[in-house]
Each structure stands twice: as structure tokens, then as C-alpha cells.
Amino acid sequence: MKKHIVISDPYPRRLFLIFSKKKLKELKSKYKLLKAPRLNKKDFYEKNIHKATFILGQPDLNKNLLSKATKLKCIINVESNFMDNIDYDYCFKKKIDVIATSPVFAKPVAEIALGMTLSILRDIHNAHFDFVKGKEKYGLESNLSSSLLT
């Protein structure tokens, strides 16, 4: 059976950040991946978009280019940002799904949000700058402007 073609263009992400080893192996076994180059992407898409069933990335896809994508079923936006670089109206009319990988980043985003919240509440970032300048404060004085999360 002929494998569906996936254009792999996750930049600035890399596939190992999006898929577990097991899922990446499964992806590669079930689909033929065409890796988009970092340079000359427009030429690459002009030559290959007609082959693709799926696109994994968020490349610039105008109506003209999308009109050549006769097999395209879905664009998986790996940034989950839905920038204005894809003709979404055309995709909607042609029933090309555009989906996001948001759950992939849920834990890292939650962790950084918690870290930033604690830094703000405990004034860690300013304490660090004071330490670097040799002006750090100790004891009660270092906690006067701090707050608790609870």
C-alpha cells in the first residue's frame, strides 16, 4: 500500500520536541516524510505540495500555492499560533483542516508560568540582579516585598 506523504516543516520546532520516540517511529513507519529545507522553501513547496496529504508545520501557504495541493487534507500547525501566513478561508472552503499541537506544550507552558509567578511573588529576578551587583539583601529585608502564592 502506498504511504501518504507528509511534508515535515516544523521549524522552529524539531520533530523530537513534538513526538515521543515511539510516536515518531510510528509516524515514519506509516507515512512518507518529505523534509522541507530551511532555505528555498517556496521552490520546495511549488515542486512538492501537490504530493502532500498532510503538512506538519506553519509554512507560508497562499491561495495560489494551496490550489495546487489537491491531496491536502490537513495542516498541523506546530506553533499553535495561527499566524496570518496561511489562507485559512481557502482551507475552510476546500475542507482542509488546520489543527494545532497545543497539548504538546501544555506542561512546559504551565511550568514556565508557575516559575515566572513564583519569581514575581518572591522577587527572585530582582534579588538575582542585586546579587550580581554585590548588593544582595539577607534575612527579613530580602523578603519585605515578597508575597505568598497561597
Locate the predicted segments by residue.
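An N-terminal-biased, well-structured beta-alpha scaffold segment characteristic
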Residues: 1-99
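Phosphate-binding beta-alpha-beta segment of Rossmann-like dinucleotide-binding domains, i.e.
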Residues: 94-96, 101-150
